[in-house]
Amino acid sequence: MKVALPKGVFDIFPYITDAKHMWRHTSLWHRVEDVIHEVCDLYGFSEIRTPVFEKSEVFLHVGEQSDIVKKEMYTFLDKKGRSLTLRPEGTAPIVRSFIDNPMSQREDNKFYYILPMFRYERQQSGRYRQHHQFGVEAIGVRHPLRDAEVLSLLWNFYSAIGLQYMQIQLNFLGGSATRKRYDQVLRGYFLQHLDSLSSLSKERFNTNLLRILDSKEPEDQEIIKSAPPILEYVSDEDRKYFDEILSALSALNIPYSINSRLVRGLDYYTDVVFEAITTFGGHSYALGGGGRYDGLIAASGGVATPACGFGVGLERVIQTLLAQGNLTLPSSHKLRLIPVEPEADSFCFVWAQHLRSLGIPTEVDWTHKKLKAALKTADTEKVTFVCPIGERELLSEQLTIKNMSLRQEFSGSKQEVEQRLLYEIQNTSL
């Protein structure tokens, strides 16, 4: 009996050829991940990897009234009855790790991660129950230029992978005094419209007032549009902090806009929040977001420590890159040896190992199909170089390398073709 994948998950696979599923091609993921490592290294961020599952209480500080905690977590009991949860987001586990490792803490801690997340999402396009997230967390420093630096890293990532039509949207939620003052104003406003709000927003009115601004329900939109903006109620100190972030973005020519309705879906955010928005194909949607969360570490049992960060869903990033035509399969510069006759098998086996020791990616076609069919397969699979080897090549000690991309070939002794292959791989962009 065939066993199918559960709903909401997918394989990242190396042999995909159809356009619809090309976003799942392993090589595309490698390319994006390589850019992440390069950009984060430029900014002095170090990779962190946390366990796939944590004690469930780790995620309660995300906000017990958040959709993630209430509806989307994969939570189970182990054999001793302890509640464990598959990681639904990246920040809370890193905060847990930071608190767990006090001897490893520095005054300024800069982490990044590329990890799978697990959420019981409703089935819809672009939403997956296992998805992959790139994120950074900067823990230990509170400074507007640190926030701007994190935003700069995010922007440089988008630029480096070739995303277009991007803009940063920002809002400022303020500290506890600003939030308390604004909460009173917002509660009074929504109370006037309570009967017209969606059932979800009526629930949030009593549990998480600010999240009403994040509602996607049609009946809430006109009411939200007229809600008083929080920036009218921030303190002078908060406004100065926010303005310094905006000035820094302008200095780096990073396009941004202020969205006074922007709040984040996780309850731990304070002060600056942001989303990276692309407008493409007649639609606008977020490709990442984050903000500052100065209260989360203390709420999680640690010493009060300022922090900020962001998360980016990689599935949507790769799909958008393909839609914009800015991501293609890279050439592997792979060499495939084709033993035309069984007598060439041993030679191919030994030479392939030598070629690999030189740094030339090499594989052997052991199918022993006819040469024409073997060449057609190599062409379909976008193998860059092939070398058919039979009795004639073994006797003459002359080998021919076919460049399948350029439809060219070159011949010579074993040492000569090795040198030519090294040159081609190091100096040719195919």
From Swiss-Prot:
One of its GO terms (molecular function) is ATP binding. Gene3D superfamilies: Anticodon-binding domain (3.40.50.800), Bira Bifunctional Protein, Domain 2 (3.30.930.10). The keyword Cytoplasm applies. GO terms for biological process: histidyl-tRNA aminoacylation. InterPro entries: aa-tRNA-synth_II, aa-tRNA-synth_II/BPL/LPL, Anticodon-bd, Anticodon-bd_dom_sf, His-tRNA-ligase, HisRS-like_core, HisRS/HisZ. Its EC number is 6.1.1.21. It comes from the Bacteria. The keyword ATP-binding applies. It catalyses: tRNA(His) + L-histidine + ATP = L-histidyl-tRNA(His) + AMP + diphosphate + H(+). Keywords: Aminoacyl-tRNA synthetase, ATP-binding, Cytoplasm, Ligase, Nucleotide-binding, Protein biosynthesis. It is found in: Cytoplasm. NCBIfam families: hisS. Homodimer. Belongs to the class-II aminoacyl-tRNA synthetase family. This is Histidine--tRNA ligase. It comes from Chlamydia caviae (strain ATCC VR-813 / DSM 19441 / 03DC25 / GPIC) (Chlamydophila caviae). The gene is hisS.
